[in-house]
A protein has these predicted regions:
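Flavin (FAD/FMN) cofactor-binding and adjacent substrate-gating region
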Residues: 103-177, 182, 191, 214, ...
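Glycine-rich FAD pyrophosphate-binding loop
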Residues: 35-56
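Dinucleotide-binding Rossmann-like beta1-alpha1 core, especially the glycine-rich loop
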Residues: 58-142
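Short hydrophobic core segments
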Residues: 21, 232-243
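C-terminal catalytic lobe of FAD-dependent flavoproteins
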Residues: 165, 173, 248, 255-300, ...
């Protein structure tokens, strides 16, 4: 379904059951959950699907061994259950991945083994595989790239997925179920009205009405970022799922709701870790873990946890973060990567929820739990969380809206636990014109046309960063293909 089709559908309808603002993991999940229950849903995303933090993750579906060590047992248990759900419902985009955890002492050996035993115990029937111990004599065969001196390795299982691909799958699933979803559609303000009155000619922009009491959110004012046209849409329930931008859509509040943390990643050639399994570096100098992962015939290393002052549409990793990742990986790999080996550097900004986000708290100590709350004007906000638990978050948001009677509470709940997602793949375009004209490995002219016509890609970045992942894999090669991608998109009317 093309973006133009979605725009026409939105133009034919001004009133909805709910409006979701934000097309990342959280907003897309909510749109699917609401649509499967039969609500009329409008989803608006200022940029591309998963154009912010949701496409800049470490590509893992996991409970989080670090969160287990920090005592976030509920988060870990929920995430391990949801990990299996995502892999089952989006099997072409997600898979189990084995990890190795190096141990250099007897203490490390038993600590890691006991910790992973607890990790598997929390997974219960959702376990992806048993952990195992490989002694030093087996390491040379299993993972010879590791530095010598190891006592052995603990192996365990987690999940890996295509974050941007899953976002597109959720968009397709939501629209198949009846939602209208538009990317590159920026919400300018929340509309409000006096409680109990119809919206006609009474709605105000939030900025014009914050001094008035008893006003309720009744819709949004939004702009098509491509045409410049401004529209209004109305709904008794407006959900703010904008991640780190959550406070920008809210009326004035007493305290900031989120703290921000930047996570940087680097990509190097496969030769540094030529395995189908990943490695977790259990203890960096700042107390985090670091991952070394096989990813699209390359190696992904990350991530960092750097406090930052706010959201950025295009966050950049610092030189210190780049050096940190290289140094920490070099402590464990016999051949340490250098700056010259780095093909791409990129970062995402996490939104972390704590009781008072204005307090100076180490972001490493803040869990990845999510929070759902309602402002005085009725705007529903959701922040925090992680990709692995997106479905659970969406389910809880809709229960919250029903409990507060923002949507019809008589509509029965419907579980999405076994809902197969529409994982659109370009295979059917293999015989289309341009299929043999390759711009990058895996990126043909036909693929670019598929991105525009099927996935609502509207910019070169949409194609190179999120439909393919070349901008994250090898920025230089992606840049060299940008002009050809733009030419094909222009032929498609974009």
């Amino acid at each position: 379904m093309t973006r133009d089709t979605q725009l026409r559908a939105a133009a034919q309808q001004s009133e909805w059951d709910l409006i979701v603002v934000g097309g990342g993991a959280t907003g897309l999940g909510i749109a699917v959950q609401a649509a499967v229950q039969g609500y009329q849903v409008l989803l608006l995303e200022a940029g591309d699907w998963a154009g912010g933090t949701s496409s800049r993750s470490t590509k893992l579906l996991h409970g989080g061994v670090r969160y287990l060590a920090q005592g976030h047992l509920g988060l870990v248990r929920d995430a391990l259950q949801e990990r299996q759900t995502v892999i089952r419902n989006a099997s072409s985009l997600a898979k189990p991945l084995q990890f190795v955890l190096p141990a250099y002492s007897v203490w490390d050996q038993w600590r890691y083994r006991l910790g992973l035993w607890a990790y598997e115990g929390l997974a219960g029937n959702a376990s992806l595989g048993e952990s195992a111990w490989l002694d030093a004599s087996e390491v040379a065969t299993h993972s010879p790239e590791l530095r010598q001196g190891l006592r052995g390795l603990v192996t365990y299982w987690d999940g890996q997925f295509d974050d941007a691909g899953l976002a597109v799958a959720l968009m397709h699933t939501a629209t198949r179920l009846g939602a209208v979803a538009i990317n590159h559609a920026q919400v300018l303000s929340v509309l409000t009205q006096p409680s109990g009155l119809a919206h006609q000619n009474l709605a105000h922009d939030r900025d014009q009405s914050t001094e008035r009491e008893n006003l309720r959110a009744c819709g949004v004012r939004w702009r098509d970022q491509l045409s410049g046209d401004v529209h209004q849409a109305y709904a008794p329930c407006v959900i703010n799922a904008t991640g780190g931008w959550v406070d920008g859509l809210r009326a004035a509040s007493n305290a900031r709701s989120v703290t921000w943390s930047r996570g940087a990643h680097i990509v190097v050639r496969r030769e540094f870790w030529p395995h189908a399994h990943g490695m977790i570096i259990p203890r960096t100098r700042d107390g985090r873990v670091l991952f070394v992962l096989p990813w699209l015939d390359h190696v992904l290393m990350g991530t960092t946890d750097t406090p930052c002052d706010g959201m950025d549409a295009h966050p950049r990793a610092s030189a210190q973060e780049l050096d940190f990742i290289l140094e920490e990986a070099g402590r464990y790999l016999q051949r340490a990567p250098t700056r010259d080996d780095v093909l791409s550097v990129w970062a995402g900004v996490r939104s972390l929820v704590q009781a008072n986000a204005s307090l100076q708290t180490s972001t490493r100590s803040i869990g990845r739990e999510h929070s759902i709350w309602q402002d005085a004007n009725g705007l529903v906000n959701v922040a925090g969380g992680k990709w692995t638990t997106y479905r659970l978050m969406a389910e809880q948001v809709m229960k919250f809206c029903c409990r507060h009677k923002l949507v019809n509470p008589n509509i029965p709940e419907v579980s999405t636990r076994h809902l197969a997602l529409d994982c659109a793949l370009p295979d059917a375009w293999a015989d289309r014109p341009g299929a043999s004209i390759e711009l990058l490995p895996g990126v043909s002219e036909a693929f670019v046309r598929w991105c525009v016509q099927v996935t609502s890609a509207q910019t070169v970045e949409d194609v190179l960063a999120r439909r393919s992942r070349w901008l994250l894999l090898d920025a230089r090669r992606a840049s060299q293909a940008a002009a050809d991608v733009a030419r094909v998109m222009q032929e498609e009317g974009v």
